[in-house]
Amino acid sequence: MKLTCMMIVAVLFLTAWTFVTAVPHSSNALENLYLKAHHEMNNPEDSELNKRCYDSGTSCNTGNQCCSGWCIFVCL
């Protein structure tokens, strides 16, 4: 009986601890999404959705041009 009560208290404590530590990270999540979406509406050229990348086999200069991120004279 005591072990069961201790287990229940431990689970409740860990659940509460999870919620307490998660609040600062999730409280601004919607606000950050709104600000990012608002910025992308004001600057559509800077939107991540407009970024182009090269398919494999296409010549490249740097890895950030390739969709895979790997560039050795051609996108891998």
Curated annotation (Swiss-Prot):
Gene Ontology molecular functions: ion channel inhibitor activity; toxin activity
Tissue spec. comment: Expressed by the venom duct.
Residues excised as propeptide: 23-50
Domain remarks in the Swiss-Prot or TrEMBL record: The presence of a 'disulfide through disulfide knot' structurally defines this protein as a knottin.
InterPro entries assigned to the protein according to its UniProt record, in alphabetical order: Conotoxin (IPR004214), Conotoxin_omega-typ_CS (IPR012321)
Disulfide pairings: 53-67, 60-71, 66-75
Domain of life, source organism: Eukaryota
Keywords in alphabetical order: Cleavage on pair of basic residues, Disulfide bond, Knottin, Neurotoxin, Presynaptic neurotoxin, Secreted, Signal, Toxin
Recorded GO CC terms: extracellular region; host cell presynaptic membrane
Location within or outside the cell: Secreted
Signal peptide coordinates: 1-22
Family (UniProt): Belongs to the conotoxin O1 superfamily.
Name the record gives this protein: Omega-conotoxin-like TeAr94
Described purpose of this protein according to its UniProt entry: Omega-conotoxins act at presynaptic membranes, they bind and block voltage-gated calcium channels.
Major localization class: secreted
Organism from which the protein derives: Conus textile (Cloth-of-gold cone)
